[in-house]
Amino acid sequence: RIYVNGQQVGMTKVSKTPAEFNVTNYLKEGENLLAVQIYRWHDGSYMEDQDFWRLTGIERDVFLQAYPKLTIWDFFLKSSLDSIYKNGIFNATVDLREFTGNNVKKGTLKLELLDKTGKIVLSQQKKFDIEDEFTQLAFSGVIKNVSKWNAEKPSLYDCVITLWDDKNKQLAVTACKTGFRKIEIK
Protein backbone atom coordinates (compact mmCIF):
# COMPACT_ATOMS: atom_id res chain seq x y z
CA ARG A 1 0.00 0.00 0.00
CA ILE A 2 1.17 3.51 -0.79
CA TYR A 3 0.34 6.46 1.47
CA VAL A 4 0.99 10.17 0.97
CA ASN A 5 0.52 12.39 4.00
CA GLY A 6 -1.41 9.64 5.79
CA GLN A 7 -3.91 8.99 2.98
CA GLN A 8 -3.90 5.75 1.00
CA VAL A 9 -3.14 6.46 -2.66
CA GLY A 10 -3.20 2.90 -3.97
CA MET A 11 -1.90 -0.61 -3.67
CA THR A 12 -0.37 -3.35 -5.75
CA LYS A 13 0.03 -7.06 -5.12
CA VAL A 14 2.44 -7.70 -7.96
CA SER A 15 6.04 -8.10 -6.89
CA LYS A 16 9.04 -7.64 -9.19
CA THR A 17 7.03 -5.27 -11.39
CA PRO A 18 7.00 -1.46 -11.31
CA ALA A 19 3.90 0.24 -9.93
CA GLU A 20 2.95 3.86 -10.61
CA PHE A 21 0.42 6.04 -8.82
CA ASN A 22 -0.73 9.60 -9.50
CA VAL A 23 -0.31 11.33 -6.14
CA THR A 24 -1.05 14.89 -7.31
CA ASN A 25 -4.27 15.26 -5.30
CA TYR A 26 -2.56 14.10 -2.09
CA LEU A 27 0.36 16.55 -2.11
CA LYS A 28 0.56 19.81 -0.17
CA GLU A 29 2.89 22.83 -0.22
CA GLY A 30 6.19 22.14 1.50
CA GLU A 31 7.28 18.81 2.92
CA ASN A 32 5.25 15.67 2.19
CA LEU A 33 5.45 12.18 3.67
CA LEU A 34 5.57 9.12 1.38
CA ALA A 35 5.02 5.79 3.17
CA VAL A 36 4.96 2.23 1.81
CA GLN A 37 3.40 -0.72 3.64
CA ILE A 38 4.71 -4.14 2.55
CA TYR A 39 3.10 -7.52 3.25
CA ARG A 40 5.13 -10.73 3.06
CA TRP A 41 2.27 -12.82 1.63
CA HIS A 42 -0.96 -12.02 -0.20
CA ASP A 43 -3.75 -13.89 -1.95
CA GLY A 44 -1.78 -14.02 -5.22
CA SER A 45 1.57 -15.19 -3.80
CA TYR A 46 1.14 -18.72 -5.15
CA MET A 47 0.90 -17.31 -8.69
CA GLU A 48 4.34 -15.75 -8.29
CA ASP A 49 5.91 -19.08 -7.33
CA GLN A 50 8.84 -18.91 -9.72
CA ASP A 51 12.52 -19.72 -9.56
CA PHE A 52 13.81 -16.76 -7.55
CA TRP A 53 14.51 -15.90 -3.94
CA ARG A 54 11.35 -15.23 -1.98
CA LEU A 55 12.51 -12.09 -0.24
CA THR A 56 10.27 -9.38 1.13
CA GLY A 57 10.96 -5.68 1.00
CA ILE A 58 11.76 -2.90 -1.39
CA GLU A 59 14.31 -4.05 -3.95
CA ARG A 60 14.42 -0.99 -6.18
CA ASP A 61 14.23 2.78 -5.81
CA VAL A 62 11.05 4.48 -4.62
CA PHE A 63 10.75 8.06 -5.82
CA LEU A 64 8.38 10.88 -6.68
CA GLN A 65 8.57 12.30 -10.16
CA ALA A 66 6.93 15.49 -11.40
CA TYR A 67 5.81 15.76 -15.02
CA PRO A 68 4.70 18.74 -17.07
CA LYS A 69 1.02 18.82 -18.11
CA LEU A 70 2.07 17.38 -21.49
CA THR A 71 5.02 15.00 -21.62
CA ILE A 72 6.76 12.13 -23.35
CA TRP A 73 5.19 9.24 -21.46
CA ASP A 74 6.67 6.17 -23.13
CA PHE A 75 8.46 5.05 -26.26
CA PHE A 76 9.42 1.84 -28.06
CA LEU A 77 12.41 1.50 -30.39
CA LYS A 78 12.90 -1.36 -32.85
CA SER A 79 16.30 -1.50 -34.53
CA SER A 80 16.88 -4.29 -37.03
CA LEU A 81 18.81 -5.04 -40.22
CA ASP A 82 17.70 -5.44 -43.82
CA SER A 83 17.81 -8.81 -45.63
CA ILE A 84 21.49 -8.41 -46.58
CA TYR A 85 22.52 -7.25 -43.06
CA LYS A 86 23.97 -3.98 -44.35
CA ASN A 87 21.45 -1.23 -43.65
CA GLY A 88 19.63 -0.52 -40.42
CA ILE A 89 15.84 -0.52 -40.29
CA PHE A 90 14.63 1.77 -37.52
CA ASN A 91 11.09 2.09 -36.17
CA ALA A 92 9.89 3.99 -33.13
CA THR A 93 6.60 4.82 -31.48
CA VAL A 94 6.36 7.63 -28.94
CA ASP A 95 3.43 8.10 -26.57
CA LEU A 96 2.60 11.60 -25.37
CA ARG A 97 0.42 11.99 -22.27
CA GLU A 98 -1.75 14.94 -21.36
CA PHE A 99 -2.57 15.63 -17.71
CA THR A 100 -5.42 17.70 -16.27
CA GLY A 101 -4.92 21.41 -16.84
CA ASN A 102 -2.86 21.05 -20.01
CA ASN A 103 -3.19 24.04 -22.35
CA VAL A 104 -0.81 22.79 -25.05
CA LYS A 105 -2.89 21.32 -27.86
CA LYS A 106 -0.37 21.43 -30.72
CA GLY A 107 3.35 21.00 -31.06
CA THR A 108 6.25 19.14 -32.58
CA LEU A 109 8.01 15.94 -31.60
CA LYS A 110 11.54 15.42 -32.89
CA LEU A 111 13.45 12.15 -32.94
CA GLU A 112 17.17 12.01 -33.70
CA LEU A 113 19.51 9.05 -33.97
CA LEU A 114 23.23 9.78 -33.46
CA ASP A 115 26.21 7.52 -34.07
CA LYS A 116 29.11 7.13 -31.62
CA THR A 117 30.83 10.27 -33.00
CA GLY A 118 27.70 12.37 -32.40
CA LYS A 119 26.79 12.60 -36.10
CA ILE A 120 23.04 12.66 -36.72
CA VAL A 121 22.19 9.68 -38.96
CA LEU A 122 18.40 10.08 -38.74
CA SER A 123 16.32 13.13 -37.88
CA GLN A 124 12.55 13.37 -38.16
CA GLN A 125 9.93 15.79 -36.84
CA LYS A 126 6.20 15.22 -36.52
CA LYS A 127 3.54 17.82 -35.81
CA PHE A 128 0.78 16.72 -33.48
CA ASP A 129 -2.65 17.76 -32.19
CA ILE A 130 -3.68 16.63 -28.71
CA GLU A 131 -7.22 15.25 -28.69
CA ASP A 132 -7.06 12.49 -26.06
CA GLU A 133 -5.14 11.73 -22.88
CA PHE A 134 -2.67 9.69 -24.95
CA THR A 135 -1.33 10.52 -28.42
CA GLN A 136 0.98 8.16 -30.29
CA LEU A 137 3.41 9.18 -33.05
CA ALA A 138 5.40 6.79 -35.26
CA PHE A 139 8.83 7.27 -36.82
CA SER A 140 10.75 5.08 -39.26
CA GLY A 141 13.83 5.22 -41.42
CA VAL A 142 16.74 3.38 -42.99
CA ILE A 143 20.31 3.98 -41.88
CA LYS A 144 22.75 3.18 -44.72
CA ASN A 145 25.83 1.09 -43.85
CA VAL A 146 24.78 0.89 -40.21
CA SER A 147 27.35 0.01 -37.57
CA LYS A 148 26.01 -3.30 -36.28
CA TRP A 149 25.76 -4.36 -32.65
CA ASN A 150 27.25 -7.66 -31.52
CA ALA A 151 28.88 -9.04 -28.39
CA GLU A 152 32.41 -8.45 -29.66
CA LYS A 153 31.75 -4.94 -30.95
CA PRO A 154 28.72 -3.49 -29.15
CA SER A 155 28.12 -0.46 -31.37
CA LEU A 156 25.29 1.66 -29.98
CA TYR A 157 23.43 4.71 -31.27
CA ASP A 158 21.91 7.47 -29.15
CA CYS A 159 18.21 8.16 -29.70
CA VAL A 160 17.10 11.62 -28.52
CA ILE A 161 13.39 12.52 -28.40
CA THR A 162 12.41 16.17 -27.86
CA LEU A 163 8.93 17.64 -27.34
CA TRP A 164 8.08 21.27 -28.19
CA ASP A 165 4.85 23.21 -27.93
CA ASP A 166 3.46 25.24 -30.84
CA LYS A 167 5.41 28.31 -29.62
CA ASN A 168 8.69 26.35 -29.96
CA LYS A 169 9.17 26.05 -26.17
CA GLN A 170 10.89 22.81 -25.19
CA LEU A 171 8.64 20.80 -22.84
CA ALA A 172 10.50 17.51 -22.45
CA VAL A 173 13.51 15.57 -23.68
CA THR A 174 14.54 11.96 -23.15
CA ALA A 175 17.24 9.72 -24.57
CA CYS A 176 18.39 6.12 -24.67
CA LYS A 177 20.77 3.87 -26.55
CA THR A 178 19.86 1.35 -29.25
CA GLY A 179 21.79 -1.15 -31.32
CA PHE A 180 21.14 -2.66 -34.73
CA ARG A 181 21.14 -6.44 -34.99
CA LYS A 182 19.03 -9.27 -36.32
CA ILE A 183 18.51 -12.60 -34.60
CA GLU A 184 16.97 -15.39 -36.62
CA ILE A 185 16.98 -19.14 -37.12
CA LYS A 186 17.10 -20.26 -40.75
Name each region found by the language model.
Residues R1-K186:
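Secreted/periplasmic carbohydrate-active enzymes, especially glycoside hydrolases
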